[in-house]
Amino acid sequence: MVYLLPQYKTKLLRVPVVEKTVRVWNESGRERLKDCFEMTDWQVFIDSCDGLDELNDHVSGYINFCEQNALEEKTVKIFGNNKPWVTKEMKSLLNEKKRCFMEKNKERGKQIQNKIKLKMKECKKSYKEKIEEKFRTNDSKGMWAGVKQMIGFKDKETKISTEKGKEKEYCDQLNNFYSRFDTYDFSKEIQNIKKDVSENNDHILQIERHDVLKLFRSLKSNKASGPDDVKPKTLKTFAFELCDIFTHIFNFSLKFNIIPTSWKTSKIIPVPKSKTAKEMNDFRPVALTPVPMKCLEKFVLKSFLPTCEPYLDPNQFAYRAKRGVEDAILFFTNNVYSHLDTPKSYVRTLFLDFSSAFNTIQPHLLIPKLLNMGVNKNICLWILEFLTERPQFVFLKCGNTSFLSSINVLNTGAPQGTVLSPILFTIYTNDCRGSFNNIPFIKYADDTIIQALINTLNDLLNYYDEIEKFTKWCSDHYLQLNVKKTKELIFDFRKKNNTHDPLMIKNETVERVTEYKYLGVVFDENLNWESQAAKVNGKMNQRLYFMRKLNSFNVDNVILALFYQSCILSILAFCLPAWGGNAREKEKRKLNRCLKSACKIISENPQNFDALSLALCAKKLNKVIEDETHPLYPQIRFSSRSGKLIHIRTRTVRFSNSFLPFAIRNHE
């Protein structure tokens, strides 16, 4: 009888080698490209081209042609499993170890393993010194890239899975899905606006050469190019050589209110909203537009935004100077705490959700709003041109293969990812405001809250009335309210009569939730902040793991301290003044434990949760005091005799520990 003993061999996980062709930006290549642009007579392009479209296409094509010929191309292999500190010598030792394993030479294998350990320490030390040198030379981008490699941090990628052979069809379906709001024909209304506004005496906006130079030099080299393939690195590096021709193109566009078709073209990249993206609605349509167009948008925005500022809703916290997420959260929580401090009161909060809000802007409704704010009529015509007849296509990457959809031309919406779109949406929704002081509308871009501070039955009826008005306003402005994703959260600490009728919108019941995540902060109906603290604690512990991995490289303590401040402490500090005062001791202990572990690594005295909360509250209060236009400023009162802040009277502990009463009480 023969007994055959099976022998099993572990199969290693292998990442396929990726070959990539890149252009080498070395010194000789830069000099060749610079000479090419310096020797170019741009006047030849201007004289020989008929119209702005042709001129822009020729200039863009010429820039790409010069870049292709002046810069050398190099094919590189990317080994997925290789770390940057694995040198050739290290690789040869690892291969030698594999051979010993295959030959079952244990003695030789042990010797090689000892050599690998020593070599690994040497390689990691060398790589660590490179990263520290980048820090000393203020190369923050290179330093953070190296730190990510050391801690093993990778950006999460969600692959788009489609049926094989139907990728192009799916690509077209995505483009049609993103174009679904362009169903109305308002061409007559748009033509009437053009006719009424075109005859005006307003000055024509003009851009100077030094403005273009400044815009090009401020570009980030690593950003993606648009459909015209003109790279920001090229414009930034050769800003002096290219600014003349683009100054001419920009001024031509502003004078005649014409935008080249290629500049209005959007290359849509579907970006997953979550890890489990399956349906088309789970992908956010981010538009890549030409870099020169973004520069021109910045100039136009700077020209008309100061005119609009006085008219903007004070409860709109996005895209405003001296405003941010923290201000919106503080205004929201202060309303809740201060109102609940009065007897027999409760708060009903409606968190509204729009379907692709930016894609629903109607130009014929937006332009009159701009005109009413006193914006230059020629700028209004230029913005109208920017929003109408916009070609767009979807770019889809499945594995190593790319697919392009057919082109759709749109007259509705503003592309996500452009400079002007956010502020245009803010202006579009600017007149959507509450009619009652106790029912404010709090807005952060398209994240809108209707907050009802209720004491009486009449207040409740006003709340229902406001929702009805808001629904009608959305219908009149072609904004699609997603009732399924709209939620209601109720804060009610009354002992009796705390039953609430469900809210109805468009004959659909709005779901009432016990907690809701708004702008990164988790609110619960009991205001105990347990879920928020747990979320923060989980994130901090994840980053603490990365910090320990970084410490294993024996990096300089300054870099460790920077990592602690930027990646761990910042998580806790985010909106801490809004909830820190009312956090429970149980949650504080967990967070203090995490802070203590991190500070131990960098050999510093551990920071305390309460001390950090107090410091951040004081800092924020000073900013509010300095800004008289802040929505919280009217709540602050000064003594006529001493000039000191007057303490806010409170009835409940939760209001006493909230931001304003707590910060004013501890103000020096």
Residue map of PLM features:
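Catalytic palm active-site di-aspartate
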Residues: 1, 226, 265-268, 284, ...
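Surface-exposed loop/turn segments and immediately adjacent short secondary-structure elements
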Residues: 9-11, 21, 28, 32, ...
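Conserved, non-catalytic sequence blocks in retroelement Pol enzymes and Pol-derived host proteins
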Residues: 50-54, 80-88, 102-107, 134-138, ...
